[in-house]
Design a protein with these regions (language model features):
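Negatively charged, low-complexity tracts enriched in Asp/Glu with abundant Ser/Thr
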Residues: 1-31
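Mixed-charge, Lys/Arg-enriched low-complexity segments
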Residues: 56-95
Length: 95
């Protein structure tokens, strides 16, 4: 998977800011990625969120739900381990 620079900007209808961390892998037909978003402007200003994204093999974000196959879990877990703030927010989700 091509490395994407972080931090980098994102913009959504309800706010914009920076992608602070990203954990992604090459998944064959797509490249799943989890992104830590930090809102700097808009109605979500000051909040953080996790975006579950799917990229095409060409590196473009796809407009569809992210599906992660269980065979991808170990590789994605290793990438999440390199993103401590994202990992902490995910931990809050599941614990």
């Amino acid at each position: 998977m091509p490395q994407r620079r972080v931090p980098r900007a994102f913009s959504l209808p309800w706010g914009s800011g920076q992608i602070l961390e990203e954990a992604g892998i090459e998944g064959g037909l797509h490249a799943p990625a989890l992104q830590l978003l930090n809102y700097e402007l808009g109605e979500k200003k000051g909040q953080q969120a996790i975006r579950f994204a799917a990229y095409s093999v060409e590196g473009e974000m796809e407009d569809r739900p992210l599906i992660i196959n269980e065979r991808e879990f170990d590789a994605l877990r290793r990438e999440i381990d390199r993103s401590p703030r994202l990992k902490a927010l995910l931990r809050r989700l599941v614990e």
